[in-house]
Design a protein with these regions (language model features):
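Acidic/His- and Gly-rich active-site-bordering loop/insert found
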Residues: 1-102, 120-127, 361
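Short helix-capping segments at alpha-helix termini
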Residues: 37, 122-126, 156-158, 289-298
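Fold-level recognition of mixed alpha/beta catalytic cores in primary-metabolism enzymes, strongest
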Residues: 99, 104-105, 109-218, 237-239, ...
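Short beta-strand micro-motifs in enzyme catalytic cores
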Residues: 52-56, 183-185, 261
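Metal-dependent amide/peptide-bond hydrolase catalytic core
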Residues: 186-395
Length: 395
C-alpha cells in the first residue's frame, strides 16, 4: 500500500465522470501524472451524444514490436437519484476493509493502481512499449474504444501497436477471455388516438405493445433453451443468448387511447454467434403480427424496429503471454467468461487480443455504496508491475 495510490484514487473518484458529462478534467489529471514519468500522452477528442469527451493514450518505452496495452474506462454510471446511497458518491471513504466511492470497483480503482505502478516504474528497463489507453463512454456502449481502437496506429506513430491488451474491469482478480455481444434496439408502436370511451374508433399502442412483448418473450424462451456444451463452463450462469426488456414508455392520460408506445430491448449473444441474427428474427416475427388491439376496431397499429447500438463479442485465444502472466500474478489456473461487455471487443476488431482482469467485484458495480475490498486494491500495483516486467522488460 502507498499513500500515492490512495491519493490518486481520491482524486479520481472526486471527478464527476458520469457518461453524460465531460471527462476532460479527469483525463487531464491522469495525463499530468504520467507525463513527469516520461510518458508521451495524446488526447483524442470524441463527440459523444453531444458531450465533448476525450480518450487518453499514454506510452513509454522503445518503438519495438510486442509490448502491452493496459486499459480502463474513466466514465461511471449515474448516482443522482439512485436509492440506497449512505455515503457521498464522489468522496473516497475507507471503512474497515472496504473503500467506498463511485468508480472504486468500476473502474477508477484499477486506473489508480495503473498510475501507482507507473509512478515507480524504471523506464530504462523497458525493452518493449507500455501503452495505457483510458477511454470515455464505456458505460453507454463502449463508444470511446470504438473510436480509439482503429486510431492507435496513427496516435502511436513510430511505436508499433501492441497486440495484447489487459482490460481491468471488475473480476475479483479472476481472468476472463470471453464475453457476449450486446445489441440494443427499440420497438415503436404507432396506434390511433381517441377517447377511451370509444376504444373501437382507435387502436391502443400499449395493447399492441403487449403482443409485441409476448412475441419477443416467447422467442426469449427459445433462446434460453439453446445451451451449447462448449459454453457451459465459460458462462455457467447463462450459457445461452439472453434478452432483457429495458424501458417502456407510452400514454399520457387514463381517458385517452394511447397513440404511441416505445420499448427498448437489449440482448446478448454467445461469442460465436452473429449478433444481428436475433434482431433480424425479431423483426421477422413482429412483421407477422396483426396490429389490431383488443377492442376489435378497424385501425391497425404500425410496428417499427430500429437498431440502437452494437458491442461485439469477445472470444480471445487461449495460451497467450498475457494470460500466462495474469495466471502467475493472480494464482488463477483457468479463464472464463464475463457477464458484461468491454472495450476489449473493439480492441479485438483492431487486431489486439484482450483479456479481462481487475480488482473490483461485479456485484458492487453500478450499486449504491459501491466499494472495493482493501486487500484487492492494495495488491494491485505490485501485480501490474509484475505483468509489465514480464511482457515489457524481460529479454
Amino acid at each position: 500500500m502507498s499513500d500515492y495510490l490512495y491519493d490518486v484514487a481520491k482524486r479520481l473518484v472526486a471527478f464527476d465522470t458520469v457518461s453524460s458529462k465531460s471527462d476532460r478534467d479527469a483525463m487531464d489529471y491522469i495525463a499530468g501524472e504520467l507525463a513527469p514519468r516520461g510518458f508521451k500522452t495524446a488526447l483524442q477528442p470524441v463527440e459523444l451524444s453531444g458531450v465533448a469527451q476525450v480518450n487518453l493514450v499514454a506510452w513509454l518505452g522503445p518503438p519495438t514490436a510486442d509490448g502491452l496495452i493496459i486499459s480502463g474506462h474513466v466514465d461511471t454510471v449515474p448516482f443522482d437519484g439512485q436509492p440506497g446511497w449512505e455515503r457521498a458518491p464522489l468522496t473516497l471513504e475507507i471503512a474497515g476493509e472496504r473503500i467506498y466511492g463511485r468508480g472504486t470497483t468500476d473502474m477508477k480503482g484499477f486506473i489508480a493502481q495503473c498510475l501507482d505502478a507507473a509512478h515507480t516504474l524504471d523506464s530504462t528497463r523497458l525493452k518493449r512499449p507500455l501503452v495505457f489507453v483510458f477511454t470515455a463512454s464505456e458505460e453507454i456502449g463502449c463508444l470511446g474504444a470504438h473510436s480509439v481502437g482503429p486510431a492507435l496506429k496513427q496516435i502511436l506513430g513510430e511505436t508499433p501497436v501492441p497486440r495484447l491488451a489487459w482490460i481491468g474491469e471488475p473480476t475479483s482478480w479472476g481472468v476472463s477471455h470471453a464475453h457476449k455481444s450486446i445489441v440494443s434496439f427499440q420497438v415503436t408502436v404507432r396506434g390511433a388516438g381517441g377517447h377511451s370511451g370509444a376504444p373501437a374508433k382507435g387502436v391502443n399502442a400499449i395493447a399492441v405493445m403487449a403482443r409485441v412483448m409476448d412475441t419477443i418473450g416467447g422467442y426469449q424462451q427459445e433462446l434460453t433453451a439453446r445451451r451449447p456444451a462448449e459454453y457451459l463452463e465459460v458462462f455457467p450462469d447463462a450459457p445461452c443468448d439472453v434478452l432483457n426488456f429495458g424501458t417502456i414508455h407510452g400514454g399520457i392520460a387514463l381517458n385517452m387511447i394511447t397513440e404511441e408506445c416505445k420499448l427498448r430491448v437489449s440482448y446478448r449473444t454467445l461469442p460465436d454467434a452473429e449478433p444481428l441474427d436475433v434482431f433480424h428474427e425479431i423483426e421477422r416475427r413482429l412483421a407477422a403480427l396483426d396490429g389490431h388491439d383488443y377492442a376489435g376496431g378497424e385501425h391497425r397499429a404500425k410496428i417499427e424496429t430500429s437498431l440502437l447500438n452494437i458491442v461485439p463479442p469477445l472470444n480471445s485465444p487461449r495460451g497467450t503471454a498475457l494470460e500466462s502472466a495474469l495466471f502467475e500474478v493472480t494464482g488463477e489456473k483457468t479463464s472464463g467468461g464475463a457477464l458484461y461487455g468491454t472495450d476489449g471487443s473493439w480492441f479485438t476488431r483492431s487486431g489486439i487480443t484482450s483479456l479481462i482482469c481487475g480488482p473490483g467485484d461485479l456485484e458492487q458495480a453500478h450499486q449504491p455504496n459501491e466499494h472495493v475490498r482493501r486487500d484487492a486494491f492494495d495488491r494491485g500495483p505490485a501485480m501490474i508491475r509484475k505483468v509489465i516486467e514480464r511482457l515489457c522488460c524481460a529479454a
